[in-house]
């Protein structure tokens, strides 16, 4: 039975020691987190007026990279949005941006006006473009649910892991030699497996480095679209659904093969 011990936690970051799981399972979770989690991002921009020095295409690109809060609990499942089962209007949010400069002014992400108060820029102070007196920007932007496998602007979080190192210091002089790489050689949470291996290259046979089988240090960092608890909950839901679809496909394949033999 896999076991998890949380060693560091904030609303947007989590580090834990995972034990008793196969690498394939841990890596599957990592890949779902970095490429499958749904988030809102601006995907379509209708420029009504743009007299700034920035091209419309670059302006739209910048808008798309602004992270938006994404209340998954009040949105349809991403699968329904992708398949068309959900009303498209429930999977999109309209923004407007209208700025007329009376002097030098910087347009920030906070100037975007959303039709939904729960879908807004995560950070209000992301600069979009600078305007001088007489310039203006008027546009409509539409954000939709998407996944990072389609474009990086839909990436909700990063995740990674390393094998839990097991370090044996055979000569105390090695600690000082490796201090710039690892302050505490025997602390797996500070000295990653790769760092320990770097120290082994420095110390030779004075340091032995191994790893514990099926034990890892796993961490997740959210970009702020939602907290890390929501990210993990959604990642497990997606992973569980993938396994169910895979088993169903296997069952159908097996059934078809059996019928063919008859």
Curated annotation (Swiss-Prot):
Q: Which InterPro entries match?
A: DNA-dir_RNA_pol_30-40kDasu_CS, DNA-dir_RNA_pol_insert, DNA-dir_RNA_pol_RpoA/D/Rpb3, RBP11-like, RNAP_Rpo3/Rpb3/RPAC1, RNApol_insert_sf, Rpo3/RPB3_RNA_Pol_subunit
Q: What EC number(s) are associated with this protein in UniProt?
A: 2.7.7.6
- Assembly with partners or alone: Part of the RNA polymerase complex.
Q: Which reaction does it catalyse?
A: RNA(n) + a ribonucleoside 5'-triphosphate = RNA(n+1) + diphosphate
Species this protein is from = Pyrobaculum neutrophilum (strain DSM 2338 / JCM 9278 / NBRC 100436 / V24Sta) (Thermoproteus neutrophilus)
Give one Pfam family: RNA_pol_L
Q: Does the keyword DNA damage apply?
A: no
Give one GO term, molecular function aspect: DNA binding
Family from the record: Belongs to the archaeal Rpo3/eukaryotic RPB3 RNA polymerase subunit family.
Can you say where in the cell this protein is located?
Cytoplasm
Query: What Gene Ontology biological process does one annotation of this record name?
Result: DNA-templated transcription
UniProt entry keywords in alphabetical sequence: Cytoplasm, DNA-directed RNA polymerase, Nucleotidyltransferase, Transcription, Transferase
Reply yes or no: does the keyword Nucleotidyltransferase apply.
yes
List the protein's name.
DNA-directed RNA polymerase subunit Rpo3
**HAMAP family annotated for this entry?**
RNApol_arch_Rpo3
Stored Gene3D superfamilies: 3.30.70.3110, DNA-directed RNA polymerase, insert domain, RNA polymerase, RBP11-like subunit
Q: Show the GO cellular component annotation of the record.
A: cytoplasm; DNA-directed RNA polymerase complex
**Function description:** DNA-dependent RNA polymerase (RNAP) catalyzes the transcription of DNA into RNA using the four ribonucleoside triphosphates as substrates.
């Amino acid at each position: 039975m896999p076991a998890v011990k949380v060693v560091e936690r904030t609303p947007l970051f989590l580090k834990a020691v995972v034990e008793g799981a196969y690498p394939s399972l841990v890596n599957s979770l990592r890949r779902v987190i970095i490429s499958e989690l749904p988030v809102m991002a601006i995907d379509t921009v209708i420029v009504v007026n743009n007299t700034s020095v920035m091209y419309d295409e670059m302006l739209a690109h910048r808008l798309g990279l602004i992270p938006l809060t994404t209340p998954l609990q009040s949105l349809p499942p991403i699968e329904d949005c992708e398949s068309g089962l959900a009303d498209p209007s429930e999977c999109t949010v309209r923004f407007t941006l209208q700025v007329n400069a009376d002097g030098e002014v910087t347009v920030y992400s906070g100037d975007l006006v959303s039709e939904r108060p729960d879908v807004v820029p995560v950070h209000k102070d992301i600069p979009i473009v600078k305007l001088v007196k007489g310039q203006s920007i008027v546009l409509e932007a539409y954000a939709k649910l998407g996944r990072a496998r389609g474009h990086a602007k839909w990436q909700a979080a990063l995740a990674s892991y390393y094998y839990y190192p097991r370090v044996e210091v055979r000569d105390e002089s090695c600690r000082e030699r490796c201090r710039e790489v690892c302050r505490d050689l025997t602390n797996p949470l500070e000295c990653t497996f790769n760092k320990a291996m770097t120290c082994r290259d420095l110390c030779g046979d004075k340091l032995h480095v191994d790893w514990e089988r099926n034990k890892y240090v796993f961490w997740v960092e959210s970009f702020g679209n939602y907290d890390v608890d929501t990210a993990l909950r959604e990642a497990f839901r997606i992973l569980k659904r993938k396994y169910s679809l895979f088993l169903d496909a296997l069952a159908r394949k097996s059934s078809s093969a059996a019928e063919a033999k008859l």
